[in-house]
Amino acid sequence: MPIGVPKVPYRIPGDEEATWVDLYNVMYRERTLFLGQEIRCEITNHITGLMVYLSIEDGNSDIFLFINSPGGWLISGMAIFDTMQTVTPDIYTICLGIAASMASFILLGGEPTKRIAFPHARIMLHQPASAYYRARTPEFLLEVEELHKVREMITRVYALRTGKPFWVVSEDMERDVFMSADEAKAYGLVDIVGDEMIDEHCDTDPVWFPEMFKDW
């Protein structure tokens, strides 16, 4: 049984023959990124660095970010979101599996009209939580104040990008709200449900793949 990252044949432009390289390296060359774990500093630096590099390499071609994550650290998630708004290319966000907590915030940060959820994906939003609830009282009060500011900022972003009133989003974030792909589309978190893309192309293409994969 193979262990580690799968290798696939890939011909680097200019080379005569294909070489075996890590699957993820091929996907990066094709401007396809994956967020498939809890959001922490390391994966945040990895994804934001790739976004900046791909933007410098080609500022016109879209970047695809696949998301299957339970969420994670607030500041790390906000760093990815802000990078998505800063780089020149449009960024597709595609949810498969689950996009919970800060992962749903990143899903929301994709280019409007280019936010996609697979038919059986689950999306969850809730209010930010603090890891310092056992701190001494003065530290705890400072943490609560900062958390309140961050919560308001995140709520405003959700309201702005979904078109929902601020108070509606704020009330929804008081608890864990799980949504299906269709419910997330109705809420404004995504623009397209994956099976809609299949229906759109099945009349003309028996098997449809994104443009970047057609030469494979």
From Swiss-Prot:
It catalyses: Hydrolysis of proteins to small peptides in the presence of ATP and magnesium. alpha-casein is the usual test substrate. In the absence of ATP, only oligopeptides shorter than five residues are hydrolyzed (such as succinyl-Leu-Tyr-|-NHMec, and Leu-Tyr-Leu-|-Tyr-Trp, in which cleavage of the -Tyr-|-Leu- and -Tyr-|-Trp bonds also occurs). Keywords: Chloroplast, Hydrolase, Plastid, Protease, Serine protease. It comes from the Eukaryota. Its EC number is 3.4.21.92. It is found in: Plastid, Chloroplast stroma. InterPro entries: ClpP, ClpP/crotonase-like_dom_sf, ClpP/TepA, ClpP_His_AS, ClpP_Ser_AS. The keyword ATP-binding does not apply. Its main location: plastid. It holds the Pfam family CLP_protease. PROSITE patterns: CLP_PROTEASE_HIS (PS00382), CLP_PROTEASE_SER (PS00381). The active site is at residues 101, 126. GO terms for cellular component: chloroplast stroma; endopeptidase Clp complex. GO terms for biological process: protein quality control for misfolded or incompletely synthesized proteins. One of its GO terms (molecular function) is ATP-dependent peptidase activity. Belongs to the peptidase S14 family. Component of the chloroplastic Clp protease core complex. Cleaves peptides in various proteins in a process that requires ATP hydrolysis. Has a chymotrypsin-like activity. Plays a major role in the degradation of misfolded proteins. This is ATP-dependent Clp protease proteolytic subunit. The gene is clpP.
